[in-house]
Amino acid sequence: MRCGKSRRFQPALIIALLVFLCSSVAGQDFDVIKNKVKEHVLGNGMKFIVLERPDVPVVSFHTYADVGSAQEVSGITGISHLLEHMAFKGTKTVGTKDFGVEAALLDQMDQLYAQLSREQRAVNPDSAKITALQEQFDKAKKAAHELVKVGEYSDMLDEQGGRGLNAYTNSDATQYITSLPSNRLEFWMAMESDRFLNPVFREFFEERDVVMEERRLGVETQPTGKLVEDFFAVAFKAHPYHHEVIGHMSDLRRITRQDVQEYFRTYYSPSNLTVAIVGDVKAEDVFTMADTYFSRIPSAPKPERLRTEEPEQWGERRVTVEAQAQPMLVVGYHRPDVNSTEDLAFNAMANIFGQGRSSRLYKILVKEKKIAVDAGSFNGWPGKKYPNLFAVYAVPAMNHTSAECMDAIDAELVKLIREPVSQEELGKYKRQTKKGLIDGMKPNSQMAQTLTFNDVVRGDWRKTFDAVKELETITMADVQAVAAKYLAKKNRTIGEIVPEKEGAQQ
């Protein structure tokens, strides 16, 4: 999500910005970089990770909230993503013309909406009462909107030279990013701490409508979106990876501002937040300011890790979406989480098997057999923190079917199980991945993201710098072993988009 006003950067500006945000790590030993990273945990449990890079006067900020759609329960699915939208609406002092008056109107709206919702869902709803309540609600909503300074939070950051303000939610986390000139460090501290200390979820109903429209456009009118939603629901019977980040429409319609406030109090406690700051700063300055600004946020226990585990699958599952759309095939095999000792082998297998035009799947299905226009594989679907899926997909070519693609995929999977990958394939994967790891450390923003991910999900930001050494330990036997262990038919779910049957909509 990009908050505030829409902007389109010209290519030249994008290139300039990337250069501006980059610091070269070429030729530096990873241990040298690792030794420059410092960490500090506030008394309330909030953690700050800092990497000093004085090359250019810019600093990137990455705030990682350890909460995603996997934390949601029935009735509030989609609330993590909705809260991400609400997090840019301002505070008691930012985004309002008169908070005292506005606060009273927001409370009035909450009360009216609760009454309206109860009456609408009553066994015998009173239509006259519903109409009266709706009129009162609309009047309060209009009055509250007139007090809003729309987009003030993002405008204030832009005025201070901010770039790349964004946020996104997935199954595992919600993350907030931006970059500022390095002499605006304290400005960011004041703004970000106020956002978590004094949030005001104004324009809630307007933003909820925006999210509902996202669902309509991305799921309810898109066969691919519908396939993904149904696929997760079938592949995961117990674990909350079974629902999409966007949530169910019936839940979105009924989520209240109080629901969001309660969710925020639970999952945005300081102990559940990790911040990485990379750029032209001094770690001691960062820690001093963090103590001043963020220690104001009251401490609270870190939410308990999810208890529910997905049970072993005992047989192949299938899901079909009928639509007048491009046919598609997706297959998912259950696999362990990112902290498993087998994760490295899974990554190598996904790359060799189905990533890029030189991968096995693409060469066989697209180039040689010409039964697909695209094919590939990937890991970590829909998340990485908990056991997830190794996925394979194919888009059948005209006059060809998903069944043909599935047969060809199965034939290649058998080879993967019975025969080790070649030394050439594994060597190519290691070289490409090593380059990607090094390149990924260049942009300040990407480095900040990697540090927070490794610290929260993998348990220690230092693992960022172990990746290349770990890469070298993968063997051909490791890849063959995970293929043989996990790529069984009884461990998979198959999803398809197929042509809609004649008369289906009549």
Which residue ranges define each predicted feature?
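Non-catalytic beta-strand/loop surface segments
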Residues: 26-71, 96-183, 205, 217-272, ...
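Bacterial N-terminal signal peptides that target proteins for export
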Residues: 1-14
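Active-site recognition of the HExxH zinc-binding catalytic motif
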Residues: 77-85, 89
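Bacterial N-terminal signal peptides
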Residues: 12-24
